[in-house]
Regions:
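Active-site/ligand-binding loops adjacent to catalytic centers
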Residues: 8, 20, 74-155, 193-195
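Surface-exposed amphipathic alpha-helices with a cationic face
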Residues: 69-76, 168
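Short glycine/serine/threonine-rich phosphate/pyrophosphate-binding segments
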Residues: 58-68, 91, 156-164
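Gly/Ser-rich phosphate-binding catalytic loop and adjacent alpha/beta segment
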Residues: 1-14
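Phosphate-binding loop/pocket of nucleotide- and phosphate-handling active sites
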Residues: 107, 120, 162-195
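Short beta-strand segments
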Residues: 25-27, 58, 83-85, 179-183
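Short gly/pro/ser/thr-enriched loop/turn and capping motifs at secondary-structure boundaries
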Residues: 1-3, 87-92, 188
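Active-site/ligand-binding-proximal alpha/beta "capping" segment
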Residues: 18-59, 70, 124, 128, ...
Length: 195
């Protein structure tokens, strides 16, 4: 994140250089999670008529996962949340051990989930479990979702679907309601995973 070429650094630099620009800082600006607390959480609760038992989402900035999870857990403290992570990210190990292990950090292809930092929007107390998904498993699921379901979604979304399905195989029982949000479209991946 401190490398001047990183997107974190470039965004900060551009904000300083461009008059009247705005740097939303989606990682540490708690308005990110608050927006999902006020909108996404209530929408899911209403649309499932309060029957949701499990909520799964990719974790990158933490906003959609944690803002939504906070609202849903206030409605149902027994709700289980599953964060989807990628190999090369620190989230899962940090949740399980409390240790920020730099050995967990290495390059990966999946965009939109996983990080080599701990954003302020990631509230680990709101995430019950983490599942890691490989780049390959996500890529395979990308094509499967497009063919079988007609869903043209981004790489992080298919990681969430793959991870949630893996979790569901072992943990869900009849009557459970699992909601996964898919906040990314596939157009930006035409030259990547869809190529």
């Amino acid at each position: 994140p401190e490398d001047p070429r990183s997107y974190y650094s470039v965004a900060r630099r551009l904000n300083k250089e461009i008059p009247n620009s705005f740097y939303p800082n989606q990682y540490d600006n708690l308005s990110n999670a608050q927006a999902h607390y006020e909108t996404t959480g209530p929408e899911i609760w209403k649309d499932t008529e309060g029957r949701i038992t499990h909520y799964a989402a990719g974790v990158g900035t933490g906003g959609s996962m944690c803002g939504t999870a906070k609202y849903l857990k206030e409605q149902n403290p027994n709700l289980i949340t599953v964060g989807l992570d990628t190999y090369g990210s620190v989230f899962k190990k940090y949740k399980e051990t409390g240790i920020f292990d730099e050995k967990e950090i290495y390059p990966y292809l999946t965009e939109g989930i996983g990080e080599d930092i701990l954003p302020k929007n990631v509230d680990f107390s709101l995430i019950d479990h983490f599942i890691k998904v490989t780049d390959k498993d996500a890529a395979v699921m990308t094509r499967r979702l497009a063919r079988e379901e007609g869903l043209f979604v981004g790489w992080s979304c298919v990681s969430a679907v793959h991870g949630a399905l893996e979790y569901a195989k072992e943990h869900l029982k009849e009557g459970d309601v699992l909601v996964i949000i898919l906040p990314d479209h596939g157009t930006r991946y035409l030259g990547k995973v869809y190529n």
